[in-house]
Swiss-Prot record:
Belongs to the YajQ family. It comes from Prochlorococcus marinus (strain MIT 9301). This is Nucleotide-binding protein P9301_05061. Disulfide bonds: none annotated. GO terms for molecular function: nucleotide binding. Nucleotide-binding protein. It comes from the Bacteria. InterPro entries: DUF520, UPF0234-like_C, UPF0234_N, YajQ-like_sf. GO terms for cellular component: cytosol. It holds the Pfam family DUF520. Keywords: Nucleotide-binding.
Amino acid sequence: MAESFSFDVVSDFDRQELVNTLDQVKREISQRYDLKDTDTLVDLDKENIFIITNSELTLNAVNDIIRQKAIKRNLSLKIFDYGDIEIVSGNKIKQTILLKQGIKQEIAKKISKNIRDQIKKINVSINGETLRVASKSKNDLQLAIKIVSELEESLNIPLKANNFR
């Protein structure tokens, strides 16, 4: 059995689902009685979501709506890294939500070490912001996927296994 099997460990999300989520959030803000006249702005750029609104109460309501809609669209809540609340012009406040994507080098090393400590006959290589896990045994790979899913909780980043070969 010279054939080798592998999969990639990545930390990413479906950007289109996030865009759809924020469209639903904007629609709900414009229709909800308590949020309709608050001049709340929700905006998305490449790496952040910006929320500008009148009060902290409104901000908390918008954050709750974002979480609810993200869950319904199968987005992990771990992709959101909530920043501090800033006071902008006059009576407006702003919060920046950083979107976590990619596995940082030190976290990749922790994941790699953890997998190798528990499974001896497995190769883990770090390729930029992804990890490639390879083995000759499919059972070892299934065990590695289980280890990765357990690590996801302790590291507080969304991890997915894909590109099974």
